[in-house]
Swiss-Prot record:
Similarity section: Belongs to the neurotensin family.
Purpose: Smooth muscle-contracting peptide.
Name by which UniProt lists this protein: Neurotensin
Gene name linked to the record: NTS
Species: Gallus gallus
Primary localization: secreted
GO cellular component, one term: extracellular region
Length: 13
């Protein structure tokens, strides 16, 4: 699942 954190940097959980 692809999510975007508050810093607008993509990361995968």
């Amino acid at each position: 699942q692809l999510h975007v954190n508050k810093a607008r940097r993509p990361y995968i959980l």
